[in-house]
């Protein structure tokens, strides 16, 4: 998967289109990512020791990886490619040519 935890990404589709934020979690088995402050859902929690009455908690839900683009250091969003630099495989922004790793 081309997105890693800690990458700065721009959401390119969905209700949060245009938002730029950091990836909190990458879920490669299901091709999804959790992005900070994006796709907030309300979860109804059952009563437990912490909340004896239960609660409605807002949390970030995963979005599909195809709905985000990785930003480079200059803030340019583009597709991610792979190339070898000094014998190491690195990710780079195909639009700007900037190395991401």
Swiss-Prot record:
Listed transmembrane segments: none
Statement: the UniProt record of this protein carries the keyword Ribosomal protein: yes
Keywords (A to Z) from UniProt: Ribonucleoprotein, Ribosomal protein, RNA-binding, rRNA-binding
UniProt KW Transmembrane keyword: no
Entry's Gene Ontology molecular function annotations: rRNA binding; structural constituent of ribosome
Gene Ontology cellular component terms for the protein in this record: ribonucleoprotein complex; ribosome
Superkingdom of source: Bacteria
InterPro entries given in the database record: KOW, Rib_uL2_dom2, Ribosomal_uL24, Ribosomal_uL24_CS, Ribosomal_uL24_KOW, Translation_prot_SH3-like_sf
A single GO BP: translation
Short name of any one Pfam family annotated for the protein: KOW
Function: One of two assembly initiator proteins, it binds directly to the 5'-end of the 23S rRNA, where it nucleates assembly of the 50S subunit. One of the proteins that surrounds the polypeptide exit tunnel on the outside of the subunit.
UniProt record similarity statement: Belongs to the universal ribosomal protein uL24 family.
Subunit annotation: Part of the 50S ribosomal subunit.
HAMAP family given in the database record: Ribosomal_uL24_B
Protein name as catalogued: Large ribosomal subunit protein uL24
Biological source species: Streptococcus sanguinis (strain SK36)
């Amino acid at each position: 998967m081309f997105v890693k935890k800690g990458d700065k990404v721009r959401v390119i589709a969905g209700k949060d289109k245009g938002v730029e934020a950091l990836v909190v979690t990458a879920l490669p088995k299901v091709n999804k990512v959790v992005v900070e402050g994006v796709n907030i859902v309300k979860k109804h929690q059952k009563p437990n020791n912490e909340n004896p009455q239960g609660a409605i908690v807002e949390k970030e839900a995963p979005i599909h990886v195809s709905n985000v683009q990785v930003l480079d250091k200059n803030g340019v969003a583009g597709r991610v490619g792979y190339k070898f630099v000094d014998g190491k495989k690195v990710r780079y922004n195909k639009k700007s040519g900037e190395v991401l790793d």
